[in-house]
Amino acid sequence: PFQPFNRSPQIRYRYTSGKGLQLTGAVLWQLQYLSAGPNGKSEEYIKNSCIPEVYVSADYKVDGLIAGVGMEVLSLKPRQQTTVDDRVYKVNERVTSLSFEAYAKYMTQDWVIAGKTLLASNLTQACMLGGYAVTSVDPRTGEQEYTPYRHSMTWLNIVYGKKWKPGIFVGYAKNLGTSDELVSDQLYGTGTNLDKLITAGAELTYNVPHWKFGVEYTLSSAWYGKLDKS
C-alpha cells in the first residue's frame, strides 16, 4: 500500500508548456474503486456528497528526469439519516480530506531510479491504508462529525542494466493518526489498526524483445497498535 492505484471515470485536462512544465487537473467519480464507510466500501458516500474527487499536479521533465508534486481532495457524506429510539432523523454529515504527493524518476540507458512520498488522507478508494473516525455525536439525533486518518508513505525503486536487470525496492508506511480527538471506537477504513509497515524487495530480470523473465523476493513486516482516542 505505498503507491495509489485506481481506475475511475474522469475528466482530465493537461497543459504542456514546451519547456518541460506540465500541469494536470482532473475530476473523478467512483465506480469500481470505492471509499470505505458505515456500509463498507460503497459508491453511496460520494453520491450523497454530490462533489467529485479532485486531483491537480505539476510535473517538470528534463534530460531523463521527471519530478513533480500533486494534491487530491475528497469530500464524502457517510450517512444521510440515523435512527435513535425508533425515531428517524435526517443528518448532514461530511468528511473532507486532503492528500499530497511528491515524486521523481531519473532514467539513463542503464539506470532507473524512482521514488515517491505521500501524506495520504482517507485514500481507501486508491487501495491505500486509511479511513476516518468519529469526533462527536449528537445525543439527540445521532449525527456524527468525523476526522480522516493520515498516513505517511514513502518508496524507492532502483534498477540497473539492459538485458540483465537487478533491482531493489524499499517502502515505509506510518500511521500518523488523526488531527482531532476521537469519542468512539467506531472506525471506517482499511488498516486503521496498523502502526507502521516496512517492505524490502530484490529482483533480477532477463529482458529480450517482447519477453521478460524474472525472480523477485519481498519481505514485509507490520506493527499493529491499539486505538488511542486522545
For each of these PLM feature ranges, what is it?
Residues I11-Y15, V56-Y60, A102-Y106, G115, ...:
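Residues on the lipid-exposed face of transmembrane beta-strands in outer-membrane beta-barrel proteins
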Residues P1-D59, L129-Q144:
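Surface-exposed coil loops of outer-membrane beta-barrel proteins
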Residues K61-L194:
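Detector for outer-membrane/organellar transmembrane beta-barrel domains
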Residues Y33-S35, L176-S179, S221-K226:
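Short active-site-adjacent structural elements
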Residues F2-N6, K47-E53, V91-S97, E145-H151, ...:
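Transmembrane beta-barrel outer-membrane domains
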Residues D195-S230:
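C-terminal amphipathic "assembly/sorting" segment characterized by alternating charged
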Residues Y13-T24, Y60-A67, M107-D110, K163-K165, ...:
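Short loop/turn motifs that connect adjacent beta-strands in outer-membrane beta-barrel proteins
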Residues L23-W29, V69-S75, I168-A173, G214-S221:
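Transmembrane beta-strand segments that form the barrel wall of outer-membrane beta-barrel proteins
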